UniProtKB/Swiss-Prot annotation:
Position of the Glycyl lysine isopeptide (Lys-Gly) (interchain with G-Cter in ubiquitin) cross-link: K312
Cytoplasmic topological intervals: 200-211, 302-321
UniProt-listed InterPro entries: NEDD4/Bsd2
Keywords attached to this entry: Endoplasmic reticulum, Isopeptide bond, Membrane, Stress response, Transmembrane, Transmembrane helix, Transport, Ubl conjugation, Vacuole
Principal cellular location given in the protein's record: endoplasmic reticulum
Gene name per UniProt: BSD2
Pfam families: NEDD4_Bsd2 (PF10176)
Name this protein carries in UniProt: Metal homeostatis protein BSD2
Bilayer disposition of the protein: Multi-pass membrane protein
Further remarks about this protein from its record: Present with 3070 molecules/cell in log phase SD medium.
Keyword Membrane: yes
Lineage: superkingdom: Eukaryota
Length: 321
């Protein structure tokens, strides 16, 4: 029995020793594995750090080269211009933005009442609709039946340059002095005087005076076209007295009271055509003279009509007063 117990004790010791050796071996193996993984991790970390350092170096080198070639401000300006050009040519974004803005504006203003939302008393829309119906313009027949007033075309605004004068068709009537002065200027300078007085007229009297002067100019031109008869100085249907010389070679010594001479009474019956041409008056002269006469009469008639209108308006204003 004691021998068996000794054998069992030895076997147990051997088992414990084997297990301890196995544990030591396992621990050693784990330690070796940990050391191997640590070394591998360190090698990997080192390689990553080297790669990052290389990348940083390459990027820093690239940035330094780009900064040397292109300045930073120029790159920013170029980026801004490119962005502006892109926004300018981006048509789709513009269309969508406009649509969204329109829809948002409609939605925002649809539920509000404008400036009257903060007021307790708001205007009634029914009254405005009734007033609009009452302010309907008249029909064509009603407007045609309404005659123009008697003072139509008359301007009584005293703030204008024509103070206290009645304006007809935008011009004051004027007086006789303006009429005579423009007649004198238009007649004296003929066409140039007519242009100056007609363009610069400020009244009906000045206008009609310039036209009257033009008519007198035409009458003068028509009269100047009529030919003059030389024999009219002696008298109509009379011929000049001619004397007959005894010696034709002594014509230089002829005196009035030197000798008695005989009158030459020879008359030719041939038609030389001189008197017939002088007696005929050209039709152009007649036309120009009649044109001038018509212009003068028309100017006087127009001025008289304007004066009658002025008198009529003055009488109406006095009756109303």
């Amino acid at each position: 029995m004691p021998e068996q117990e000794l054998l069992i004790g030895q076997e147990m010791n051997t088992l414990h020793a084997g297990s301890s050796t196995d544990g030591i071996n396992v621990g050693n193996a784990g330690r070796t594995r940990d050391t191997q993984t640590g070394v591998e991790g360190e090698t990997e970390i080192g390689s990553d750090e080297e790669d990052s350092i290389e990348d940083e170096g390459s990027s820093s080198g690239g940035n330094s080269t780009t900064e040397r070639l292109v300045p930073h401000q120029l790159r920013e300006q170029a980026a801004r211009h490119i962005g502006k050009i892109g926004r300018h040519f981006n048509i789709l974004d513009r269309l969508f933005k406009k649509r969204t803005q329109q829809s948002s504006d409609i939605q925002q203003g649809a539920m509000f009442d404008g400036v009257f939302s903060n007021l307790s008393a708001k205007p009634d829309t029914t009254e405005t609709e009734g007033n609009n119906e009452q302010d309907i313009p008249p029909t064509y027949d009603e407007a045609a039946a309404d005659m123009a007033p008697s003072y139509y075309g008359m301007d009584l605004n005293n703030s204008d340059i024509y103070y206290d004068e009645i304006c007809i068709e935008g011009l004051p009537v004027g007086n006789i002095a303006n009429l005579l002065w423009n007649i004198i200027v238009s007649t004296s300078f003929q066409f140039i005087g007519f242009l100056i007085t007609y363009i610069l007229h400020t009244s009906h009297a000045a206008k009609q005076g310039s036209r009257f002067g033009l008519g007198l100019t035409f009458i003068g031109y028509g009269y100047s076209m009529i030919p003059n008869d030389v024999t009219s100085k002696v008298g109509k249907n009379k011929s000049l007295n001619r004397m007959e010389l005894e010696d034709p070679n002594e014509f230089d010594d002829v005196r009035l009271n030197s000798q008695s001479t005989t009158q030459d009474k020879f008359e030719s019956h041939l038609n030389h055509g001189l008197d017939e041409e002088k007696q005929n008056i050209p039709w152009l002269a007649v036309f120009v003279a009649f044109l001038g006469l018509f212009i003068t009469l028309k100017s006087i008639y127009d001025y008289i009509q304007v004066k009658k209108l002025e008198k009529k308006y003055l009488n109406q204003s006095q009756n109303q007063a």
